[in-house]
């Protein structure tokens, strides 16, 4: 496997652990103020932010198998920024829902 693909796969694995395990656990414990708790919600929010729109308008499904290296790296960075509090999950969730027509401005 080429080096770039290997690194992309590692980033995707990190993204999956962060959104499927780490962030849901934090949402149920130390980060109860977060607006979501389920893994698919974290994935929606992060992927929408990375794609700057509804992710499935930009990526084939399943998204994790179709992320570019840059998208995977951005997703991991964004997850870490959300966890550290450097990026506001509430704001990202609202933007994601706006893109999806779920809430009005």
Model region roles, listed by residue range:
Residues 1-105:
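Positively charged, phosphate-engaging catalytic surfaces used for nucleic-acid and nucleotide handling
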């Amino acid at each position: 496997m080429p080096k770039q693909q290997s690194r992309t796969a590692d980033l995707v694995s990190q993204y999956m652990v962060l959104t499927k395990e780490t962030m849901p656990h934090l949402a149920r414990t130390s980060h109860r103020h977060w607006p979501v708790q389920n893994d698919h919600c974290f994935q929606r929010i992060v992927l929408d932010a990375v794609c700057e729109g509804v992710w499935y308008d930009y990526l084939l499904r399943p998204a994790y198998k179709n992320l570019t290296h840059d998208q995977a790296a951005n997703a991991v960075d964004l997850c870490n920024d959300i966890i550290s509090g450097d990026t506001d999950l509430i704001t990202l969730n609202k933007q994601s829902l706006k893109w999806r027509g779920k809430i009005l401005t």
